[in-house]
Amino acid sequence: MSLTAKDKDTVRAFWAKASGKAAEIGSDALSRMLVVYPQTKTYFSHWKDLSPGSEPVKKHGKSVMGGVADAVMKIEDLNAGLLNLSELHAFTLRVDPANFKILSHNILVVMAIMFPKDFTPEVHVAMDKFLAALSRALAEKYR
């Protein structure tokens, strides 16, 4: 499922609205992932507090959404644009790439909750395709 020019424009336009709340989106999405998919906690066992909204969760959620913001800027070539992040996750952090899809789903849920009027079906499909493409780009170095 590739991103069309219209999808890319939709992602950019929605991100322009959502980016002001990126840290909140990231914190809530990561919190949800850790609760709903407790197996993902294994990657964060070095944190003292894994509870929803804790400082480590907020900090990493903000970092995740910084990566999403970077991906929006590099939407024309996500594989090349996210090469360093792909290498980090594959070789250093050794995150199972299946978790990218899990976190992407939670990001979509939070965006839909936080922006109910803006999260139209068109935005939903464009953001879903974008986050899937971002996940594939992050998984690129696993091959």
From Swiss-Prot:
Tagged with keyword Heme: yes
Pfam families: Globin (PF00042)
GO biological process annotation, one example: hydrogen peroxide catabolic process
InterPro entries associated with the record: Globin (IPR000971), Globin-like_sf (IPR009050), Globin/Proto (IPR012292), Hemoglobin_a-typ (IPR002338), Hemoglobin_oxygen_transport (IPR050056)
Annotated keywords: Acetylation, Heme, Iron, Metal-binding, Oxygen transport, Transport
Tissue distribution of the protein: Red blood cells.
Domain Globin residues, every copy: 2-143
Modified residues (N-acetylserine): S2
Residue pairs linked by disulfide bridges in the UniProt entry: none
PROSITE patterns for the chain: GLOBIN (PS01033)
GO cellular component, one term: blood microparticle
Binding site for heme b: H89
GO MF assignments: haptoglobin binding; heme binding; metal ion binding; organic acid binding; oxygen binding; oxygen carrier activity; peroxidase activity
CDD domains assigned: Hb-alpha-like
Record keyword Transport present: yes
Binding site for O2: H60
Subunit description: Hb1 is a heterotetramer of two alpha-1 chains and two beta-1 chains.
Annotated function: Involved in oxygen transport from gills to the various peripheral tissues.
Note: Hb1 displays a low, effector-enhanced Bohr effect and no Root effect.
UniProt record similarity statement: Belongs to the globin family.
Protein name, UniProt field: Hemoglobin subunit alpha-1
Species, as recorded: Anarhichas minor (Arctic spotted wolffish)
Gene that encodes the chain: hba1
